[in-house]
Amino acid sequence: MERIPASAGPEAIFEAFRRDGIIVIEGFLTPDQVQRFSSEVQPGLDELTVGAPEHDEAAQTATVMDEMIGEKTKRLGQLVTRSAVFRHELLEHELMHALLEKVFVEGPMDGYWMNASEVIEIAPGSNAQPIHRDQELYDVWNRAGPAMPEAICNFISALTPFTALNGATQVAPGTHRDFTSDHLLDRDFQGRSDLKTIPAVMNPGDCIFFSGKILHGGGANHTADELRRGLAMSFIRRILTPEEAHPLSVSREIVDTMTYRGQAMLGFRSQWPVIEGVPNFYWTHQGSEIGSHIGLKEKTSGSVVL
């Protein structure tokens, strides 16, 4: 798996992403950002219990959810509401957005928004997460095969060291282009003798950027006392429904402090990127930009003046 410094820029990083489906971006977050963000989310993690939220034990999906969430894993979501560093710095990461535009924007109707964000903390004694594709969230894409454009991509940044022993994400580079419909209908990828995974070993601030088609899963934590903590930020095509219902869960007071682009990532704007001369067709109020309808102020974001 290739490792490229963030300073290499989006072109080099995206080329490796297209080839392997995954790449380690070294120094994606600064040490200062890691420290300040970690401090802001610590109270929420302290209050959180490990494992999946309470559910109907008779539900067919209960066991699957327990395995995916992890019985000794904490998952803290809704980070926009918990961290100013997240909403004003991490969600505004310029390299990240340059890569997202390369992944999702091929024509004037294309765009993207945030699917979900969470801090994932794998405790000692945790079992490995089942190998899966994030694209399983959107079954039509999964069934259509590898030729489909990306539905979802993920950035997982290390907040603590990721090692082979403490639960570094296990990944299978190249599996974004070799799957079949039969494999997609069989969740037991662990039984595939041809599947080779490697641990995404990272220092704090490093990030794995990967396709929703890549097979991966959280590793087992075999240490006695090391918590493996990471930040996952996933993004989807704007025509798809996100996991987190941000327009119904993020307060207007918080949204008013954010940039136009940040608001668009949460669904408080009709589209991102904004392309001059292209009208709004999705997520509108009678064809008008939804943010203007609800009274959000126009702002400048990056090189786009709105």
UniProtKB/Swiss-Prot annotation:
Keywords: Dioxygenase, Iron, Metal-binding, Oxidoreductase. Pathway: Secondary metabolite biosynthesis. It is an enzyme of class 1 (oxidoreductase). Fe cation binds at H132, D134, H216. It comes from the Eukaryota. The keyword Nucleus does not apply. GO terms for molecular function: dioxygenase activity. It holds the Pfam family PhyH. Its EC number is 1.14.11.-. SUPFAM superfamilies: Clavaminate synthase-like (SSF51197). The record marks S234 as: Important for reaction specificity. It catalyses: (1S,4S)-4-[(4-methoxyphenyl)methyl]-2-methyl-2,5-diazaspiro[bicyclo[3.2.1]octane-6,1'-cyclohexan]-4'-one + 2-oxoglutarate + O2 = (2S)-3-(4-methoxyphenyl)-2-[(3S)-3-(methylamino)-8-oxo-1-azaspiro[4.5]decan-1-yl]propanal + succinate + CO2. Its cofactor is Fe cation. The keyword Metal-binding applies. Gene3D superfamilies: q2cbj1_9rhob like domain (2.60.120.620). Dioxygenase; part of the gene cluster that mediates the biosynthesis of the alkaloid (-)-FR901483, a potent immunosuppressant that shows efficacy in animal models and a probable inhibitor of purine nucleotide biosynthesis by targeting phosphoribosylpyrophosphate amidotransferase (PPAT). Within the pathway, FrzG cleaves the C9-N10' bond to yield a conjugated iminium. FrzG is also able to catalyze the dehydrogenation between C7 and C8 which leads to a shunt product. The biosynthesis of (-)-FR901483 starts with the condensation of two L-tyrosines to yield (S,S)-dityrosyl-piperazine. Belongs to the PhyH family. This is Dioxygenase FrzG. It comes from Cladobotryum sp.
